[in-house]
Amino acid sequence: MADKRVLIVDDEIHIVHVVAIKLRNNGYEVISADNGAEAFELACSEKPNIIVTDYQMPVMTGMELVEKLRQHEQTKDTPVIMLTARSFAISQEQQEQLQISGCLSKPFSPRELLENIEDILYQRKLMVDN
C-alpha cells in the first residue's frame, strides 16, 4: 500500500470523512489534515503519493500550501488535486506554474475524485517506469 497513500486536506470534516471512506474501500491509505500548515508537516513526514487539498482553508490556503510544497525538496514533485467551490479561482496559468495535477469543483462525486487520483498516479507510474 506504500504507493497508494493519499493526504486529504480540508477544514470541512464531513468531506474528509466521505472521501476517506471511498479511498479506503479502494485500497488507499489515507492521512488527513484540516489546514495547510498541518498538511505541509504531514506531507514532509508521511510522504504521500498524492495530495488532495481544499482551496480555501484557515491558517494556510490550498494555494499557499502548494507554493510551499513546490519549494521543498521532499515534496516538490508530489501531485496535487485542488478542490474548490470557486472553479474560476484557479487559472490554467496558475495550475501550470504550480504543477497542480487537477482541479475539482465542489460539490464533487467521491467516485470522480477517485478516478482522478487513479489517473494521475497511473500517469506518474508510467513516467517513472520510462
Residue ranges, per PLM feature:
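Receiver (REC) domain active-site loop signature in two-component systems and cognate sites
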Residues: 57
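C-terminal output helix
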Residues: 108-118, 125
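Charged docking surfaces used in two-component/phosphorelay signaling
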Residues: 17-25
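Active-site beta3 strand of CheY-like receiver
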Residues: 46-52
